[in-house]
Amino acid sequence: MLLENFRPQSRLVTKTTRMDRAKFPVIDAHNHLGEAFGGGWDKKPLNQLIDLLDEAGVVHYVDLDGGWGEDILHAHLKYFKEKAPERFRIFGGVDWRKWESMGAGFPDWAAGRLKAQKESGAQGLKIWKPFGLHVRDHEGQLVKVDDARLSPIWEMAGELGMPVMIHVADPVAFFDPIDETNERWEEIGRNPDWAFTSPPFPPFMDILNGLGSLCPPSPFYNVHWRARGMLCREPGLGRSDAGRMSELLHRHLRAAR
């Protein structure tokens, strides 16, 4: 049997406490409604989702899928926000692909599009992981997270009162060499596009330190976070506890011991 086919079932017997509903009203501040992330709620009856949220005690739901493009943003605003405006908050995004054609005027153009998204109903800005890893400017240069040219976007978010959910980097092992010493070897083998070995990608800490030096006027929430030092240094930076299950299970149990 190949290691990749190994699916062990734990024989450890433990007490099971089933929690079907939260004790307090829940705000799900980081989630995805679209099919790309496995939910597919944009293809199902909305009442089915509302019933599920009611059952779990989720009173408010933040959908970040609009960050993938304005077509998705408008579709989700129409399908979810218009029908249940008090339940859903939909975030917009930046179309980095336009930088090549817009040239040096891209940051101002993107700030203008963010304002238009706000007017359409977007209530926040989602920045996806390609920022800092793949996004390039009109000259083909990799754009750093703290690139000063992007100030118009962050300033517009602050002016509009739009929080920014920003996902940069990934688990640190994804940036290490993919060899027998990498603790995520099996996971990366199943998902090779999760490998960001430096070089050619920027070092893990360069990306996170760039985020810490942004000092934006709008609240930033560091998604899939690295916390303590950055939170102390940056009063405008918050954190989202969203995490990969493999990270939570093995690392926090070790820390507890």
What are these regions (language model features)?
Residues 39-53, 102-117, 234-237:
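Short, acidic/polar
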Residues 1-83:
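An N-terminally biased module of ancient metal coordination in phosphate/nucleic-acid-related enzymes
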Residues 37-41, 73-76, 176-183, 230-240:
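Histidine/acidic-residue-rich catalytic or RNA/ligand-binding cores of hydrolases
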Residues 3, 43-44, 50, 203-210, ...:
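H/E-rich (His + Asp/Glu) clusters that bind or coordinate divalent metals
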Residues 29, 52, 58-61, 122, ...:
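Conserved beta-strand->loop/alpha-helix structural units within folded catalytic cores of enzymes
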Residues 2-8, 72-196, 249, 254-256:
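Active-site gating/metal-coordination segments in enzymes
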Residues 27-29, 62-65, 91-93, 126, ...:
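Active-site neighborhood of phospho(di)ester-bond hydrolases with catalytic His/Asp-centered motifs
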Residues 30-34, 167, 224:
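Histidine-centered divalent metal-coordination motifs
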